Amino acid sequence: NINKNTNTNFIPLIILFIIILSIELLTLDFSKFSQNIDYVHDGMLLTPSSNAYFLNKFWESSYIERGLFAQFSPLALWNLFDIKSIGLIHINNLILLYLNKILLVIFCSKIAQHLSSNEFIKKIYFIILSVLSVSLVSYYNLSAFPERSFLFLLFFIIFTNLFSYTKFYFSSFILGLFSVISMLWFIDIGAYINFLLLIILSYFLITKEFKKFSSILFGIILGWGLFITLIPQSEFTEFINITLSIYTNVDYYNGLIYPTPFLSGDARSTRALLLIIFAGILTILIIFNKNMKLSYENRILFIFLFIASILMFKTALSRSDTPHIKVAVGFNLFLIYAASLYILFYFFEKNEKINLQINKFLILFKKKYFNIIVIFFLLNIFILKENIIDLKNFPHSFNNIK
């Protein structure tokens, strides 16, 4: 019953997820996001945007310690809506978190597509992994996938397309453009993505896939060439100076020593390190176990996901408090969910009794209305549990945003 070459159509399920996630967004109590002002973090956005608003300069007007988009997004929103408002910052954050949820769903479909299973198993895997992944993004609390993760998730979605053999290698070219785009997004994300690009280029060079190598390299050169050409030389010079200054000194002025595992009494810091080890063990297990028949695409993807999870953990090492540790483990948790589910489904298929029960469930799953019931039930438990009581906000959602 297993056909490795069959492409499963996940689009209807993805659309259903997007509809439910959109309803969730519109049921939020938006007043809660405008009651308090974070003088430190909001000030880091408002001050550079105000300076650029009056001086019409970016790096020359402020010390940009996060990134162009990270600290000038309020300016773009002020110009877009023709109003200067602190509340627009929070709307921007909510939209990015909403988009992170959608990107996670799409990313899950990419992984499920390359499973060596039949169509129904792929869909069940996709639904469960999507629900678990989306639960890592919270509007009200700190998220394992914060706003800055948006570009990183988009990078990985495009990365999954590198293994489709097309004539023009457009995905490879777009991936190369992320070199400069990521540096203008958040400079820490820029460092992580450029490091991954270096590994990807090395991989394609070693495997002699020169067309993909040259396409990525062309995207990198073209992206940086356009950036250098389009901005004033003085701005580019300040961009280089400030970025190098941040990379050199961030651990000195922002650093908190990471708590000693098991001895510090800080359970979260110890758990975060154990999660990295656990993710590494799972990755090695499913990659080198030939019986699990992990596809080439997912094998490469899981390796790069593990590398990304280690890179992201640098955020926790730079400032080792609870919030920064939490936002640094998103890719780690996602990898654990994806790998654990894969192993679980593998053993289910090997067990005849469990496999029989799964087949009975699949008969119900074929009915579209049952798909809707399953997704809504899971979302209600894992995602909407803190927002479901605010469904009364839905009819007035757009007025509440204003």
PLM feature spans:
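Signature aromatic-anchored transmembrane alpha helix within multi-pass, membrane-resident enzymes
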Residues: F120-F126, L217-L222, Y346-P395
